[in-house]
Amino acid sequence: MSENQQTNQKEQYNLNKLQKRLRRNVGEAIADFNMIEEGDRIMVCLSGGKDSFTMLEILRNLQQSAPINFSLVAVNLDQKQPGFPEHILPQYLDNIGVEYKIVEENTYGIVKDKIPEGKTTCSLCSRLRRGILYRTATELGATKIALGHHRDDILQTLFLNMFYGGKLKGMPPKLMSDDGKHIVIRPLAYCREKDIERFAEARQYPIIPCNLCGSQPNLQRQVIKDMLRDWDKRHPGRIETMFSAMQNVVPSHLADHALFDFKNIRHGSDVVDGGDLAFDREELPLQPAGWQPEEDDDASPITRLDVLEIK
């Protein structure tokens, strides 16, 4: 076997391993939050970035082996930004045989007209885009709207709200839309951004740049992102532990009196969540909670959507 053949075999092995991990992560998120049900029509929001391309491929992959029937329709919003390559997504979606709809709305012109030069346009643009996507979901008869936010996005939002908003609030894997008419799901909620980056690079998706609008980047989010990436490098497993903490909330040991009835704690009240034992010095595990070395990925047999339970 030549050196090139050995290299290609190794690359294919690594890609298969990475795809299995992403499939497992997505399948577990779908099962944990009952994201997809029998007969669902999922509107997959496709921006042209690595996250949405990966989400679409993994959902299509799971669709083939799922114990339930559901359909997918990809939707892209062409906001008429200068330089937007209109041909890329239709060509890609035609090639892979996915049902899709391109929605053309000049939100770029609206934003430029309303927002002074030099100011960030993201907030207004996001509101306009959300409204259009909700309308499109209704027109297409979609029962769920799938967005491509991943685990790192969720953690970044948690820290943004803590640092700048004074709230212990993240980005939920599943929610009711603000118009009360649509269920929004985030199938990549358990997926690491670095896995998505590697997968997208290996798959050579036709990525569309996200800065065509010319808006200033969200500097606060970038600071948080850099902080988390630095932690991940210096303290492997810390990111997994923090995400695990979002899934293990103890209201009685926070300070939100609207969330827990502190006022009615009196003599004779039950001990809740260990009482003050929670503050005793504990032996911490050698490895952070929720963390496993990447080499152990093949140990899990969950590679299909067979973790899903129909409710």
UniProtKB/Swiss-Prot annotation:
Localization in the cell: Cytoplasm
Free-text function comment from the UniProt entry: Catalyzes the ATP-dependent 2-thiolation of cytidine in position 32 of tRNA, to form 2-thiocytidine (s(2)C32). The sulfur atoms are provided by the cysteine/cysteine desulfurase (IscS) system.
SUBUNIT field: Homodimer.
SUPFAM superfamilies xref list: Adenine nucleotide alpha hydrolases-like (SSF52402)
Motif stretch (PP-loop motif): 47-52
Entry cofactors: Mg(2+); [4Fe-4S] cluster
Record's protein name: tRNA-cytidine(32) 2-sulfurtransferase
Primary gene name: ttcA
Gene3D superfamilies in the record: HUPs (3.40.50.620)
Family in the record: Belongs to the TtcA family.
Source organism: Pectobacterium atrosepticum (strain SCRI 1043 / ATCC BAA-672) (Erwinia carotovora subsp. atroseptica)
Higher taxonomy: Bacteria, Pseudomonadati, Pseudomonadota, Gammaproteobacteria, Enterobacterales
A GO molecular-function descriptor: tRNA binding
GO biological process, one term: tRNA thio-modification
Pathway: tRNA modification
EC number: 2.8.1.-
